[in-house]
């Protein structure tokens, strides 16, 4: 079973600026990866997948072309694009109106995902959140976070700077009794 916990962040002005810069970088990476896939197909009739683009991340970061602080965030951006293309091709196979993947504006790209707990983002015991490159951010923990740490995913959204933790809990057997005359 998966639970989502949503908490509000209270960053200072410099931290807000850094998080918005990371959103810009993630959006630019998404659009550049989409452009690369489109151009490769138009010019060479070559299909590019996630692994082809993920192999380019390390050299691009070494040259300073990508400014995202966390490598896993870059990989997640490419995974998002790959899921978009998989959904597009699935709609084509089903004969539905496909809707080719579009470029995203900064306004529509509103979250950064840290795919694994501790890799770029960690919740500390004193009620603060440590984000790689940003530092400690105050967070209002209005209810306790339960579940296993290794299965937590963190997202930083632009709208009112909210942090969402997804946690897995052990599956409990649930028994229910329903009364009434509805089938």
Where do the language-model regions lie?
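Nucleic-acid substrate recognition interfaces
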Residues: 1-183
């Amino acid at each position: 079973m998966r639970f989502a916990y949503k908490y509000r962040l209270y960053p200072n002005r410099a931290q807000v600026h850094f998080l918005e810069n990371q959103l810009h970088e993630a959006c630019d990476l998404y659009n550049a990866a989409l452009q690369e896939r489109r151009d490769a197909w138009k010019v060479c009739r070559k299909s590019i997948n996630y692994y082809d683009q993920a192999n380019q991340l390390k050299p691009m970061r070494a040259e300073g072309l990508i400014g995202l602080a966390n490598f896993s965030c870059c990989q997640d951006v490419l995974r998002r694009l790959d899921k978009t293309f998989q959904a597009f091709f699935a709609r084509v196979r089903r004969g539905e109106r496909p809707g080719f993947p579009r470029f995203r504006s900064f306004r529509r790209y509103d979250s950064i995902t840290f795919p694994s707990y501790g890799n770029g983002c960690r919740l500390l015991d004193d009620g603060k959140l440590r984000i790689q490159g940003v530092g400690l951010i105050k967070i209002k923990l209005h209810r306790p976070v339960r579940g296993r740490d290794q299965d937590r995913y963190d997202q930083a959204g632009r709208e009112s700077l909210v942090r969402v933790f997804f946690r897995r809990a052990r599956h409990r057997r649930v028994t229910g009794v329903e009364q009434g005359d509805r089938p």
